[in-house]
Swiss-Prot record:
Keywords associated with the record: Golgi apparatus
Protein's name according to its UniProt entry: Protein kinase domain-containing protein ppk3
Domain notes: The protein kinase domain is predicted to be catalytically inactive.
Gene of this entry: ppk3
Domain Protein kinase: 1-296
Disordered: annotated segments: 576-637
The HEAT repeat ranges on this chain: 414-450
Compositionally biased spans, kind Acidic residues: 608-631
Keyword 4Fe-4S belongs to the record: no
Amino acid sequence: MDFIKSAASFIAKAGSQFPYDLNEKIPLSSNSVWTLQTGSIRESAQPCSVFSISLSTHPEWAELADRACETMKTLRHPCIIKYLSTYKSSTHLYIATETVRPVTTELNELSAEIKTYGLWRVSAALSFLNDKNIVHGNLQMSSVYLNSADEWIIGDFFLAGDSPQFIKDNHDKILNWSRLVPFEIQSSTLNSASFIYLDSYELGKFISHLYNGTPGDLSQRGNIPANIFVSAKKLLNVEGKQKLLASEFLKLGERPGGFFRTHLITLYELLSEVRINEEEDRVKLKQLLSSKLEVIPKNYIQKVVLNILFLLLSIDTHSDVVELLFKCAQIVKGRPDIEKDFGVPLLSLLKQQSVPIRGLLLSGIINNPDVLPKNIYEDTSFSVFANLVRSNSPTLKEHAIVVFSIIAPKLSKKTLNNELLRSLAVVQNDQHPTLRTNSTICLGKIAEYLDASVRKPVLAAALSRSLKDPFVPAREAALKVLLSVQNYFDTKDVAIKLFPSVVPLLIDENEGIRRTAEDVTDQFLSRIKNFNLGEKENVSAPAKFNGSFWSKFIHSSSASPSPSIDMKKESLELKNDTTEIKEKKNSKSRVVGNTENSKDEFNNPLFETEEQIDESWMENWNDEEETENNVEESWGL
């Protein structure tokens, strides 16, 4: 028993020292000695890939594996696999790197344009190594990987170094030396100056494999692009003036009009170098992104493009940046880590940036509600939106109200029935009439999601207050909402709480309000009559309101930019006749609207706006009125 306890203790101790949590295995080529697994570093929880090799099973690979590890430690380049850490036991060597997967498993699915981009990165990696007098010596398709952003990177540095003899002595362990390397290199005097062409030769074989599926000798072009084929053949030359180094091949491709001067590679260069300070670069970047989004890998969009666009918003406040941002979000919505890559920076910008940028972001949310990740709906995130309705900007308030109606169904009950309603109550007391109107419309939209214990008192208090609003559309909205939510109330509540608030509107100065109030009172009286006749009540959630009233919020003429909102893709028709509003301050008459001349009165400039309406009514309520309306102002919350 003591022995078993000791063994268990030893295993537990060894396990606690192991620095990685290992997950699923990633298939590699049949000739690979590596085992590749996804995982994470225990200490930091950083996601990673873990390459491991059994030193007991493959003792002949011990020196090569150590060499690969040491080389990776010293190299830092965007096109070379990023080393994180190493762990070595008596039987295994483990190397943790950035998250990668082999390109071989996806090669057949890649377009020629993406393959050319990959060739550009592989050539850049070899050029970097050769400039440092390092020969990779093992370039083949199985030594090329894709990172989490789908960027092509090279690894497998078993032979890398400046020792031609070491490469020749050990190359057969990886691939047959005589089959891969031309006779001239095999028989020539071994020196670094000539041996560096080994990488060029392997690059030529790689190009054949990349486009044609097998590492041939380039005697036939096959699917290799014609402008690449001519230069690629020179990579296989060993003697004479026609031979090319990998760095020379790269320069040929990158010169003006070269085979690496594609729009996609230019876009990648702009993104990788974060060249956004110059207006010319920003315009070029936006144009290329707009035209190439469909061919850019989704991982790259999520890990790189989104980040650059969020950064770009700090400099470029044009709406086309936000449009691109949400186009990208549409492409990668629902993917793993989207909360971190899109949700977190979005919330951060909504907290910190200027009013125009926050307005544009809110407009993007309104027009693309399906892209929002889960963390947008968390209780801790709602404070970002709640603070917007307490800002000094009518634009932000207007947008925030619409966002409330979008996110309400997915909020927790606690946030919905408390924080969101408190925020709407604040807006209903706002000095801007369109905002007060929109708060009522929003309340009607979210009523079905509220708890029953909260819904009735909130609706009664809020609508009673809105029915007294001097702004015609506000009263119209309150009547429409009241009509649509009446089934939440039993007949006694209708008679006692709702009916008395509607009756004064039967003699309203606005003919449209009077007509709507008549419709409401007729329905209420019909319910009361049926109740008195003893008919059974059916108090339940109201049927979905199909009228055009629900399709849009109204807009403030002073708020710019106004959100482009079409919640149900319907036209909005609020039927108001020409109306005169008598003001307490200057007793001037104003035309409110005429349905004969407008099909969308909520957006029509004939509607009263903040600049047109006299707000002195808010200051001139007497103490008695204030006392009576305390409950209405706070909605009883």
